[in-house]
Amino acid sequence: MKLKVLGCYGGNIPGHGMTSLLLNDTVALDAGWVSGALSLKDQEKVKDIFISHSHLDHTCTLPFLIDNNFSAPGFSLRIYAIPEVVASMKNHLFNKITWPDFTSLPNDLTPVLKLVEVAPEESVVVNGLTIRPVLVSHLVPTTGFIVEDKKCAIAFSSDTGPTHRFWEIVNGLKNLRGVITETSFPNEFQDLADVSGHLTPAALDLELGKLKRDVPVYLYGGKPKHLKAIKKQVAALKRKKLTFLEQGKVYRF
């Protein structure tokens, strides 16, 4: 399984794209930085996107990805998410006010955009990958994703505070090769992390106590203003196999 980090930050400044992970060149987990990281040619290859939740740092390049490729021959995009997230995109993003409703363009019979509802823990098979949303604990309805192919599995928590079901499923995965989870704020912002459904390094340390598998853990989601403090506090945890995702890097599992 090939994973390219298009963006891995919880905010946007030059050189820091927001959350989006590209699998095997054609499937994305979240869309915070798809059009910001990929050439037009590579954008055309992206056919399926799984959206964890409605927040802009995970959805904001969807409109531009579609707009960039609307006239490309045969282009179509399928977006998968739990019903609450699909409803949010219909009502607040592709609503003919914020952006055109591409689910009916160029016409109702052959739209370039299809919004597909997926129930929590329902598996979807795309491009040789089996992807399963799992509910986590964030400010709005949110899922992480379990991604499996014939050889391995990885788990992506998306944005979350302390959670339980995600770790239960992760611990039972065969051929687990890695976990991607978040740490958004430094410890001195614990109260803010609690009310917004995020993790600090201290809270992350408690969450990793729920992980019973000896696999690499990759961190994302840091707010650009606080990255230095977050990295220092994560290093102080002295946990082996705990590193930060690197934007632009390709990982192979």
Ranges and model annotations:
Residues 29-32, 47-57, 80-82, 155-160, ...:
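Active-site neighborhood of phospho(di)ester-bond hydrolases with catalytic His/Asp-centered motifs
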Residues 35-81, 176-177:
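Active-site metal-binding motif and surrounding structural segment of the metallo-beta-lactamase
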Residues 85-142, 239-252:
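Metallo-beta-lactamase
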